Regions:
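Acidic, low-complexity cytosolic segments
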Residues: 1-26, 35-113
């Protein structure tokens, strides 16, 4: 299967997973972005810009740390705050960020996606 088609199928599967988990208790929302567009589903629209900046900055920081310390490719990054955490997953040229309450099991969310 060509790489582009494989990546497309992975992103489409991810969209289905995001639709499944977005209604779960503790999930605040998500941002799925690629080179050309973004899908955003955040419960509090007034925080979209804040979450977008957090998403972009956290993933770039995680990738930089991985590069500096020779950790290899980043499969996911988790950033935890006082009340909220974000799970960031790079998939090819796409990026997904899932925002959740701090007490939500991000490993389960990752597996569900």
């Amino acid at each position: 299967m060509p790489e582009k088609s494989k990546s497309f199928e992975m992103v489409e599967g991810l969209r289905l997973g995001l639709d499944r988990i977005k209604g779960e208790d503790g999930i605040i929302g998500y941002i799925l972005r690629d080179v050309k567009s973004a899908s955003i589903d955040i419960r509090d629209p007034s925080k979209i810009i804040d979450y977008a900046v957090l998403s972009s900055t956290a993933l770039e920081s995680g990738e930089s740390v991985s590069e500096v310390f020779g950790l290899g490719d980043v499969s996911s990054v988790v950033v935890e705050g006082k009340d909220v955490k974000v799970l960031l997953i790079p998939i090819g040229s796409s990026r997904v960020s899932v925002f959740m309450r701090r007490d939500v099991d991000h490993e389960k969310v990752y597996k569900d996606l």
